[in-house]
């Protein structure tokens, strides 16, 4: 399993995303550039230039027409995927931490950080109404006074957004009214990442409390827990196998204050039903910040603190592997 190494960032990777077909891989990092790559051979197709700060999040819509990025330069930007042209600039009072298109690609959401005296807000815009974009007026803006949103993903059918918070809570925010529909508090520390399964029925949350947990996305019922000895930065659900991949390791500033075994930086594979670990993939120098499965389930990618993105194609025997119960 020889990985393809993507070198396009000079700072640590913050998020990677495949488009629906999986032919493109988008990567953003703590530098101002968003990159798009061919996932089959790692060729860089182009960049989206315009941000002036670290880019925290990226998303691409269902038909790969538009790309959305959110940055620490206090803006969320909409791009034409093919040409790299900036279509919209939405300015905020604080850094944009998460962003996403709903299933239709018409509604976007993004959340802002609680910093510099500003509140954390979850904002919804309708791209079909140019007035909202021009006036920079979201049709709903939900204040999150309790604890800031650290990761968010759209729920099934675009009815709500599932958001993970700094205090370990997971909430569903309605896209119609902005109210909290359901909430779950299974994690004890900050949620670093939330990703949904391919059919949007399940979500997996990765947390600083050294676990990743699986929830039913509509009821937020807690289904599974995957335990490790180190903080989990990202977790993803395989679209074809009952497998989960997790990446983590502690933050660079904590390296000297913790025991060395916490600092291991492999990607770890767990069986989704048995909660058993069955494999590890080494490679990154430093923690893994983001993992993502290819939509066909035959490869996965990871982005690290070292600024590299690695695309791993699975060996044939991975697909025949059965875990003995």
UniProtKB/Swiss-Prot annotation:
Q: Does the keyword Secreted apply?
A: no
The WD repeats are at: 8-47, 50-89, 144-183, 186-225, 283-324
Protein family membership: Belongs to the eIF-3 subunit I family.
Q: Which domain of life is it from?
A: Eukaryota
* UniProt function note: Component of the eukaryotic translation initiation factor 3 (eIF-3) complex, which is involved in protein synthesis of a specialized repertoire of mRNAs and, together with other initiation factors, stimulates binding of mRNA and methionyl-tRNAi to the 40S ribosome. The eIF-3 complex specifically targets and initiates translation of a subset of mRNAs involved in cell proliferation.
Which protein is depicted?
A: Eukaryotic translation initiation factor 3 subunit I
Q: What's a single GO MF annotation on this record? A: RNA binding
The subunit structure is: Component of the eukaryotic translation initiation factor 3 (eIF-3) complex, which is composed of 13 subunits: eif3a, eif3b, eif3c, eif3d, eif3e, eif3f, eif3g, eif3h, eif3i, eif3j, eif3k, eif3l and eif3m.
UniProt KW keywords: Cytoplasm, Initiation factor, Protein biosynthesis, Repeat, WD repeat
Main subcellular location: cytoplasm
What would be one Pfam family of this protein?
A: EIF3I
Natural source organism:
Danio rerio
Organism placement in taxonomy: Eukaryota, Metazoa, Chordata, Craniata, Vertebrata
Q: Which residues form a coiled coil?
A: none
The compartments listed are: Cytoplasm
An example GO BP is: formation of cytoplasmic translation initiation complex
GO CC term (a single one)? eukaryotic 43S preinitiation complex
Which gene underlies this protein? eif3i
